[in-house]
Amino acid sequence: MRLYYRWSAAGKVWWGYAALTEAQAVAPRLVKVGVWAGGVPSKSTDRTEHLQFWENAIDTLSACGADLILLPETINLIGAGDVISMADVVPGGPFFDVLAASAAKHHAWVCGGLLERCRDLVYNSACLLDPAGRLAGLYRKTHLYWPEVLQGITPGNGLQVFDTRLGKVGVMICYDSWWPEVSHLLAAGGADIVLFPNAGYEPAIATARAIDNSLYLAISSLYGPASIIDPSGSSVVRTEKGGVVGLLDLSVKPQCHPNAGGSLNGAPGGRSATRNSLLPAESHRAEA
């Protein structure tokens, strides 16, 4: 047992009673996560063809044993048409129904990105379906890429972490990744894994988000590689095209990158620190 106390002009430390208590070993929480790279290969604007493609993608990942399946961003965006006319009602739209039916068929958790129509507004959303095909979570992208603003898409107004039997799941979409606060707040909310559907992304930024917050990042992309990045920044699995499944043990407390913390690896921000020590920005301001 070590105590580091450094760089304080004045202060005291008292040691109280320290003891070791026997505890049961933490049971493994193994989860197979499936990610996907690439969209419909043809330039077809036939909605039926697109629906079938994504249903087949889920079938492929499920056949590899995936418990949690992630598809890319805006899978119902077909060609250069009007985004309002292509948007799905959630629940009830055709692409949503494919996600729901596939989740129920394979008894898997499925997350997919959709243009979502809610009354007079359109959002860039990600739907999380449970193994019964029910809507378990809905996240609306908060940081829009500038063309989306011109297309009339409305930003979401909050971040969420969803409780599942697999663990706590956070979601960020595409351009959200450019703001460190998004993944920081998801980690502070207890996320075991963050799902990152996108149309394209900067790999260096994605790796930094996993390292920054000591969490797993699952990536599915229309125009980039699919991968799962671990808290050290290494790829668990990766593919340039199609699907791949990675096995994660979410019972293991993620460790920071080995370079974090220097001689204070046992201190907050060091190797043994977890995302549970992170506070939302509001908390930091309140304490200032």
Which residues does each predicted region cover?
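CN hydrolase (nitrilase-like) catalytic-core segments centered on the catalytic cysteine
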Residues: V90-V110, K168, C174-G246
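C-terminal beta-strand edge segments of enzyme domains
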Residues: V161, A208-R209, N213, S220-A288
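Extracellular beta-strand ligand-recognition surfaces/modules
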Residues: M1-W14, A18
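Beta-strand-turn-beta hairpins that frame and shape the catalytic cleft
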Residues: Q24-V33, V161-G170, I193
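Acidic/histidine-rich helix-loop elements
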Residues: G38-H50
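Generic short beta-strand
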Residues: M1-L3, A126-C127, A226-S227
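Cys-nucleophile CN-hydrolase/nitrilase-fold catalytic domain and related Cys-dependent amidase chemistry
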Residues: R47-P131, Y201-A208, D212-L215
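Active-site catalytic loop in hydrolytic enzyme cores
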Residues: R117-G189, A204, A208, D212
